[in-house]
UniProtKB/Swiss-Prot annotation:
Ranges for region Disordered: 1-21
Organism of provenance: Psychrobacter cryohalolentis (strain ATCC BAA-1226 / DSM 17306 / VKM B-2378 / K5)
Protein name: ATP-dependent lipid A-core flippase
Pfam entry (one): ABC_membrane
Topology within the bilayer: Multi-pass membrane protein
Ranges for domain ABC transmembrane type-1: 48-329
ABC transporter domain boundaries: 360-595
Length: 598
């Protein structure tokens, strides 16, 4: 197998792994709202108490207007007995009003915070079930923005808007009922301005929705840039990227600022316009009410009460106008959240949960990425159980793609992969991944203790003795015991308090503790100093015993002892054999090996 051949282009059009993106078709606005309201069903009792509370609050608005009538008439009639009661009535009225406000505000907040909790947990759990291709297609900052920013905006649509609609909506209904009861002819004039108000709200709604989507997109960009700078702070500092990153962040933040100011302008025009219409209607009502034909039929108290009730309409109407902006912003965020929740999850077609021996066979396997890049083409390789096979080749040769296929992070475009004779797609994902341990160049550690990082996830049931033995086999025990609290020491975010070699040894200890029949070492010793590499190589020798091992390496001196070495180029194996055999071929491997010593 010493000759390379060109991939047959007719075979690369097979099933292509498609990376899902967040940018899917947005559902209709009404559908989004109904879906949001469905989250409120379990809290119907709290919403009922909210309605009762705000209904009490609305009733007190009527009594405030009515009280003005009684006070005015009592003064005109010089009725001292009634006047002595008014201070007590005022105190009781505002006490009842306070009880109603408390019920409404408290239970609205209860629904709101629980909704944030439920949505956030649902989105986070959804992220755990999405395929790797989703993360390749969407920046981390955009994803985290959905979890943090969009969820809060959705809550505003579902609960804060509900609070305003109930509180001020009930107040408007109560006051309009009182006005109709007091003088229905005058009150009908107020309804004349209703059509233009509704038209203004409709126009503003479309504007708010469009701008809210723009704000969300720019917030995702802001979060993405921030994540990049935080994660790559060393590169930013070492290469003097502060000015560039500052300008990039400034441009994105200004986009967000402009979108936000457009919302302010829209709201600043819409709200006064609605208020002006209401004021015009009120002016007509007051003018007519002062006509002799009208005012002669009512007392001064009734007149004051009617005008006061009409004046009290202004604030709730303004609030109902303002809530439209909040509602549209929340609906835009809801569309974004639901688009993510509707993303197809990682497909698990498996039905088998076997205990694997570690035999791997790849038969005419091809992998084509969505951008038509051919990663593997008619790839064939048989690996015996317990055998160590090293994969070498230049960047882009297909080494990492092959590993992703074995863990089903990606799926084949064509061909077949079998483990112990079983098609890989017939094995349950949980069972498959439980029997594959990986040690990567980019070590992933979590902001918790050393113990929890080694006994991570499904390994949490392991005993302290088992964890300690794994650490000893990984040559990590000694430096762990030198830490302030030993295995219970916190290692900081991403384990940055540890050296590269120490972090790698913890990763190896985790793989040892997993005790899986198949081991994948992906550039596990690159970018390390000689002492760290010495200990890690000894640890790797321990972990590779009696396991099927795939080793991806750039430095060929680390894989000379492999049972076989596969040289990849253009997504195919161009040479296969032991180190000695490949050196005798004087082909690709020999040339790469010679370059290692130049």
């Amino acid at each position: 197998m010493s000759q390379a051949y060109q991939p047959d282009s007719t075979k690369t059009s097979a099933k292509t792994p498609v990376a899902p993106t967040v940018a899917t078709l947005n559902p209709p606005k009404r559908k989004t709202l109904m879906r949001l309201l469905a989250y409120l069903k379990p809290y119907w009792w709290a919403i009922l108490l909210t309605i009762i509370g705000f209904a009490i609050n609305a009733a007190t608005e009527i009594w405030i207007a009515k009280l003005l009538q009684y006070i005015t008439d009592a003064i005109n009639q010089n009725d001292q007995s009634k006047q002595d009661l008014f201070p007590f009535i005022i105190v009781m009225l505002f006490f009842v009003r306070g009880v109603g406000s408390f019920l409404g505000n408290y239970y609205t907040a209860l629904v709101s915070r629980n909704l944030v909790y439920e949505l956030r947990v649902e989105v986070f759990n959804k992220l755990l079930r999405l395929p790797s291709s989703f993360y390749l297609a969407n920046p981390a900052g955009t994803i985290s923005s959905k979890l943090i920013f969009d969820v809060e905006q959705v809550t505003a649509a579902s609960t804060d808007s509900m609070k305003t609609l109930l509180r001020d909506g009930l107040t408007v209904v109560a006051l309009m009922g009182f006005l109709l009861y007091s003088n229905w002819r005058l009150t009908l004039i107020l309804f004349v301005v209703l059509p233009p108000i509704l038209w203004l709200i409709r126009v503003a709604s479309k504007r708010y929705l469009k701008l809210s989507k723009g704000i969300q997109e720019t917030m995702g960009d802001v979060s993405h840039i921030t994540n990049e700078v935080i994660n790559g702070y060393q590169v930013v500092k070492n290469y003097g990227g502060q000015v560039y990153e500052s300008k990039r962040f400034d441009v994105t933040s200004k986009k967000n600022l402009r979108q936000g100011m457009k919302v302010v302008v829209t709201n600043s025009i819409n709200t006064p316009a609605v208020q002006l219409l209401m004021a015009m209607a009120m002016a007509v009502v007051v003018w007519l009410a002062l006509r002799p034909a009208v005012i002669d039929d009512i007392s001064a108290g009734q007149f004051i009460s009617y005008i006061a009730a009409a004046g009290l309409l202004s604030k709730p109407v303004r609030s109902l106008t303002d809530v439209n902006q909040q509602l549209q912003r929340g609906l835009a965020a809801g569309e974004s959240i639901f688009a993510l929740l509707d993303e197809p999850e990682e497909a698990d077609t498996g039905v088998l949960s076997p205990t694997l021996a570690g035999e791997i066979k790849l038969d005419n396997v091809s992998l084509v990425y969505p951008d038509s890049t051919v990663a593997l083409h008619d790839f064939n390789l048989d690996i015996r159980a317990g055998e160590t096979v090293a994969l070498v080749g230049r960047s882009g040769a297909g080494k990492s793609s092959l590993v992703n296929l074995l863990t089903r992070t990606l799926t084949t475009s064509s061909g077949q992969i079998t483990l112990d004779g079983m098609p890989i797609e017939d094995i349950k994902l949980e069972s498959l991944r439980a029997q594959i341990a990986m040690v990567n160049q980019q070590v992933v550690l979590f902001n918790t203790t050393v113990f929890n990082n080694i006994a991570y996830g499904s390994l949490a049931h392991k005993t302290p003795a088992e964890v300690e033995q794994a650490a000893k086999d990984a040559f990590a025990h000694d430096f762990i015991m030198q830490m302030p609290n030993g295995y219970q020491s916190e290692i900081g975010a991403e384990g940055l308090q540890l050296s590269g070699g120490q972090r790698q040894r913890l990763s190896i200890a985790r793989a040892l503790l997993k005790d899986a029949p198949i081991l994948i070492l992906d550039e596990a010793t690159s970018a390390l100093d000689n002492e760290s590499e010495y200990y890690i190589q000894k640890a790797l020798d321990n972990i590779m015993k009696n396991r099927t091992t795939l080793v991806i390496a750039h430095r060929l001196t680390t894989i000379e002892s492999a049972d076989r070495i596969a040289v990849l180029d253009g997504g195919q194996i161009v040479e296969l054999g032991t180190h000695t055999q490949l050196m005798q071929l004087h082909g690709h491997y020999a040339q790469m090996y010679a370059r290692d010593f130049e």
